[in-house]
UniProtKB/Swiss-Prot annotation:
It comes from Burkholderia orbicola (strain MC0-3). Monomer. GO terms for biological process: queuosine biosynthetic process; tRNA wobble guanine modification. This is S-adenosylmethionine:tRNA ribosyltransferase-isomerase. It catalyses: 7-aminomethyl-7-carbaguanosine(34) in tRNA + S-adenosyl-L-methionine = epoxyqueuosine(34) in tRNA + adenine + L-methionine + 2 H(+).
Amino acid sequence: MFTLSDFDFNLPPELIAQTALPDRTASRLLEVDGSVAPARLVDRHFAELPSCIAPGDLLVFNDTKVLKARFFGQKASGGKIEVLIERVTGTHTALAQIRASKSPGAGTTLRLADAFDVTVGERVEPFFTLHFPAPCLDLIEQHGRLPLPPYIEHDADATDETRYQTVYASNPGAVAAPTAGLHFDQPLLEKLDAMGVERATLTLHVGAGTFQPVRVENIAEHKMHSEWYDLPQSLVDKIAATRARGGNVIAVGTTSMRALEAAARSADEAGRPLAATQAETDIFITPGYRFRVVDRLVTNFHLPKSTLLMLVSAFAGVETIRAAYRHAIEERYRFFSYGDAMLLTRRDTPEAPGA
């Protein structure tokens, strides 16, 4: 049984990338194959990704777009507040986190960005329902601020508004970027197309819960946050075709991985094949999980003790990930959202009994 301490490591703070590199594909890429022992580690640059995958493989991208979900404002009393939109729930409604000296009650009016008023509705722990006076996606885009992760120490600027989005982002709804996708630019996508690599998209709107720390030593007691995803029939068909020709399904990012595996696990439990799915998922992937769809994973380097570090450890093997992270720190890779990437190959045998 793994505990929270098993996923801790010491990271020099200067390795936390604070800004994006000027060129998306200039990031480094650590290729990790845990299917052999000891694990094979190869230092590359992200522009070399096409040489690591084969014609007929399928890359699965998350096309969610980050909302300008952060607001500063005030109560009618003048008290200052900070609001982070968690998800849009309707044309004029959203769930949000509110930081204030005292939690606002239902019916309270809040002034956001000195531009418009919202009304607080019912509490949906730990969030508040907000009612907007106009379509909330429009007001969020016009007046909000990009919500950079807490470990990035500068306020979002015009560069972040471009670089903290993937080039293929098209469905607004996330409050954090699917960061593995930040390394792809249009020329790289076109090169992959030209060599016969297939592409498909799904949508998973990344919530603020992605930064939620695990507070229990027994990780089985952790309650995972829930996120909405849409896995279309076109992707299901491409997965089937990829399997038929012997290709690999490669998830671009842990969000793509979670959507694919959530849909596949649900299908498994219902005794049916993978099908188009729109649903909430709180899937928590830890060592012992049996992967059903994904063969390889493009991902960034994750925080100590995080659920995402547990996910990649489940996928590639705990000792493989430990070795890869030690190597990355020794070689001064850049970590977290604006950092470098890994290309992982699935470990064939789960390390403990699991789902």
